[in-house]
Amino acid sequence: MDPLESLSLFFSVMLIIVVLLFMGSMVLYSLPVFEKFGIKFIVGTEWNPRKDIFGALPFVWGTFITSTIAIVFAIVISYGAAYFIVEIAPPKLREFLSSVIELIVAIPSVIIGLWGIFYVVPLVRDFLKPLSSPLSFIPFLSGETSGYSLMAAIIVLTLMITPISTSFIKNALESVPMELKEAAYALGATRYEVFKIVSKPLTRRAALAGIILAYGRAVGETMAVVMVVGNTPNISLSLFNPGYTLAAVIANEFLEATSVLHISALIALGVILFVWSLVVNTLAILIMKRVRIG
Amino acid sequence: MLRFMLKNRKFWLLLILFTVPLILMVSAPQAITLVGQGATFPEPLIMEWIIHFQERYRNITVIYKGTGSGAGVKAILSRTVDFAGSDAPMKLSEWEEANRKFGPIFHIPETMGGVAVVFNIPEVEELNLSGDVLADIYLGRIEYWDDPRIVSLNPGVGLPHERIYVVKRADSSGTTYIFTDYLSHVSAEWASTIGKTKTFSFPDAIGDRGLTGYGNAGVAQIIQQIPYSIGYVEFAYAVKGGLKTVALRNKAGNFVKPSLETIAEAAKYALSLPDPEESWHNVSIVNSPGENTYPIVSFTYILVYKYQDSPKICAALKTWLRWILTEGQQYSERLLYPSLPQNIVEIGLSAVERLQTNTGSEGYKFQLCLIFPLLLASIGIENRSCGECIGEDN
Amino acid sequence: MRPSLRSLTDKFYTAFAIFAFLILIIPLLHIILSIIMNGIKRLDLELITSPPKSLLGSGGGILHAIIGTAMVVFIAMLISLPLGFFVGLYLAEFAKGKFAHFLRTLISVLAGIPSIIAGVFAYTVIVVVYGFSALAGGFALGIIAIPYVARSTEEALGSVPMEIKEAGFSLGIERWKVVLFIDVGYAKSRIIAGFLLALARVIGETAPLLITILGGINIPSNIFSPANAIPLVIYQYALSPFRIWHNIAWSAALLLMIIVLVINLGVRYYLKIKAIY
């Protein structure tokens, strides 16, 4: 083995050791809280650091409801926006528009959070809540709000993850061979029908990978969420209520934890979050791998 | 390959680019860090102090996070901070527990402040209330703004027939402690049911009219946004938030609004304060006598360990505490906190002089205090309290 | 002719697509606009040359955060550039079969870590030993940056045409020399672009810094001292009740956006010049 190969092998092994150390220490530090509460920790509904009672469900719920609703919005908007860029916009503008969409991804999340505090929170409080008050019998839209809410978190999350899935779908749509589309046009299909019958099925896997990746981003997003979600560990159906997510509570409470069990609980939440992201990202990779072959 | 690397000019350039700054950054003098946590009551003043203190003492970094008095006391009890802030003096049981583990904890009054009762009634600018009426509002006995008892205190004011939204702190709060201490003084029923406490639940009679906010800032925000609400916040937050304040009937029978002057009056009646090495759990200056005294006033304290582990931190703490008791006080009034009367400052300074270092030990790292027992706990070893785990064995 | 259902659905979808695009673009424009409009107020010399000053005055600037960001990013690059480069090199040139697959999976795992968790790791490894420090923050950001550097290096080296490699071999040059000088030389611009993009990526990260560098007002001179950073100071000031600090937060956000934009556009321009993009 030549010197360069051994040097790079050395670094690679070092990296492997670091990552394994990382995962091992996280699991180790989360053991105490699992020892005390058992597997019930994951579905525990009460989180009260002052009484040393910890349960993960409020955060699992918050992460789940915000990410899921955000990705649903993202899927709908992405398809439309990608369709627009590829099929409707003049070809010369295409590159520019894609760059603009990708620009959103580059905005640091704390800046989106800053914008969220001063614009989205008042939007939810002064516009969306009054607008939806005739519908407030629906549990999802009930209750008063200060603006800091699951809904505000959903809005910023949607904004942050939609460009990701849009890029993927756009790239996939662009790679559909022109001959196939032209054949469909020649048979008299409308632009939408070409999309529905030709492009969509062919790009299904790539689009799915992009969507899953975007979902993974939503699950792990910390700053923008912690600045607008209200940081209250309760499980409520109403989106106007404040909530909490796994990433947000770790960021907020880690420095102020005053008992060993508290830190263990927070790290345990980190393990849950980590596993969740891992599963999501692995899924995306598996799907993408199939795309390359297929 | 090595020979090539040594001869190549670009390689040397890169090496210098990376290592020179690194060497500079590792060898530069290290700052001493003081970490504190606790009350949001004095937070704006402490922030201002830190800025000016930093300009004067460049090698001491002070960090303070407003997490609420309850969190501050908890931090002191688990030794994860160098000092804590609390509006409420430590409970006797808490103080004795800390005394056993770490030695005496000093209460050093850093400033004083008033708790303003704030309200949001669009139709009304000025409101008078008495202590027992206020207590009954918080007990849920008085439900509407035009209740006869409120009306009788405010002749000629057109109070609307609206439900009263009652706001309290969601977190464990010294501001709540001061407020409930006052309510306990003026309402026998409050004293016997809820008493003075950092956190309480709304009585059932409040029903759905109860709202909660985090920190003084949270409560201020709610009052700003919800009409017909009433709440309590530290005075500076009321002014900054543009909130209307209640004129409260004081012990002498006058209706007094909170202001620098009326709040500062209460300090005159802080006649005897305990020795720093004793518990301060009985200290209270609410409902003080005096024609022009605002009734809901308190000192806010810095809690600090008498026995320090590290000589450097001990010296830095002394410098910081001395500064805020002397030069720091000049910034108080501009931020709407009355400056401390000289006799109180003297008491504080004498306590600061008594800070001393445990001989021998280099110093604990408080983060170690949490992670190390965590490591032990994760492999099944019983975790012991922090003071024992690091200090005494060395 | 009566419009058919098919052409109606086509028109409807077109309208929907335009609508969806607008829903995406309009908030983006609003964000950019509000950053500019709110941030321009305090985008002055004082912002970048002064540490925080009295709340009763202008509030000072964020010099402490700028220096802190420089220190933290420097450490992050110190950790991630060599590590990421050599791992990417190994994957592109030397690795085979199962080990390569394992290594790539590990890189993907690392890439998917939520940034706050990288912060927790840095806390348990660095903060516990050295205290809250720029070193800890740099370590966390370094962990986050490694996959970006590794992937872009691997991709860059993979784009080297076989003819160039073969030409080197045919001249009798040893393997490692071919890789180091010819392959890396060919892909140099792309590799450097990868470095810069990783830098742009971590310069805006906040979550890991929250729990590793402590965020005080001091101007750090030593990596073992606590520090502040531009994204962190934006967070702190945004959450404070002081209007003066809100203004500074917007200006700091504008500054950060400008830095990130300059790096991103600079990289694109650089690649265009090298006739690659």
Language-model segments: which ranges?
Chain A
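Interhelical loop and adjacent transmembrane-helix boundary motif
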Residues: V225-F274
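Membrane-interfacial helix termini and adjacent extracytoplasmic/periplasmic loops
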Residues: E35-F54, L114-L159
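Transmembrane alpha-helical segments of polytopic membrane transport and secretion proteins
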Residues: M1-S12, A284-G294
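Periplasmic/extracellular loop-to-transmembrane helix junction in inner-membrane transport proteins
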Residues: M1-S6, L28-A70, P90-P91, G143, ...
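Transmembrane alpha-helices
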Residues: V100-L103, I107, I111, S165-I169, ...
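N-terminal signal-anchor transmembrane alpha helix
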Residues: F11-L28
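Alpha-helical transmembrane segments in multi-pass membrane proteins
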Residues: W61-T66, A70, A74, A82, ...
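Transmembrane-helix boundary motif in ABC transporter permease subunits
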Residues: A70-I101, L114, S132, A284-K289
